[in-house]
Amino acid sequence: MAETAYVPRLRTEYDKSIRTQLTEKFGYGNVMQVPRLDKVVLNMGIGEAVNDRKKAEQAAADMALIAGQKPIITYSRVAISTFKLRENQPIGCKVTLRKAKMYEFIDRLITVALPRVRDFRGLNPKSFDGRGNYSLGIKEHIIFPEIDFDKSGESWGMDITVCTTARSDDEARALLTAFNFPFRQ
């Protein structure tokens, strides 16, 4: 008896409807030309980690809960005396999500986390980089339901970059709109 592998909801939606919508809209001749999600990069810069190493470890633990994958702690490359920063001090953490974990994270981001942001009016439609990638910033990482603020005790910002295989911003915007990203009008 063969068991079927788990496929995330957004991946199924992409395969069934989004791919055909984009093919009709942009007139692709080949299925491989249709833009798709490539990866999602989460980054947390922790300024307080310069004075207290435990802050970077706590941020990494919180990011592991959010992403479902262990992040790496990033270290400074150069010394900056005005920030009291020495070389090789922990300054944040990052994680790259691909395949099923990427689709699960985007699903949670769109359906659960972004609606919990105070005074949320939609994502900025101008945050594309010109090559089909989209970046957004979150002021508080506690909007994710996996984080218990009482245990975490701190609230940090987070950068989220959604990398796609789209060649232009218009193609990427159409792809992310099809995934129900709430862009401002």
UniProtKB/Swiss-Prot annotation:
InterPro entries to which the protein is assigned, alphabetical: Ribosomal_uL5 (IPR002132), Ribosomal_uL5_bac-type (IPR020930), Ribosomal_uL5_C (IPR031309), Ribosomal_uL5_CS (IPR020929), Ribosomal_uL5_dom_sf (IPR022803), Ribosomal_uL5_N (IPR031310)
Cellular component annotations (GO), alphabetically ordered: ribonucleoprotein complex; ribosome
The keyword Ribosomal protein is annotated on this UniProt entry: yes
Cysteines engaged in disulfide bonds, as pairs: none
Biological process annotations from GO: translation
Gene3D superfamilies xrefs: 3.30.1440.10
A Gene Ontology molecular function term of the record: structural constituent of ribosome
SUPFAM superfamilies reported for this sequence: RL5-like
Keywords, in A-Z order: Ribonucleoprotein, Ribosomal protein, RNA-binding, rRNA-binding, tRNA-binding
Pfam families for this protein: Ribosomal_L5 (PF00281), Ribosomal_L5_C (PF00673)
Domain of life: Bacteria
Coiled-coil portions: none
Quaternary structure note: Part of the 50S ribosomal subunit; part of the 5S rRNA/L5/L18/L25 subcomplex. Contacts the 5S rRNA and the P site tRNA. Forms a bridge to the 30S subunit in the 70S ribosome.
Family that this chain belongs to: Belongs to the universal ribosomal protein uL5 family.
Record function comment: This is one of the proteins that bind and probably mediate the attachment of the 5S RNA into the large ribosomal subunit, where it forms part of the central protuberance. In the 70S ribosome it contacts protein S13 of the 30S subunit (bridge B1b), connecting the 2 subunits; this bridge is implicated in subunit movement. Contacts the P site tRNA; the 5S rRNA and some of its associated proteins might help stabilize positioning of ribosome-bound tRNAs.
This protein's name: Large ribosomal subunit protein uL5
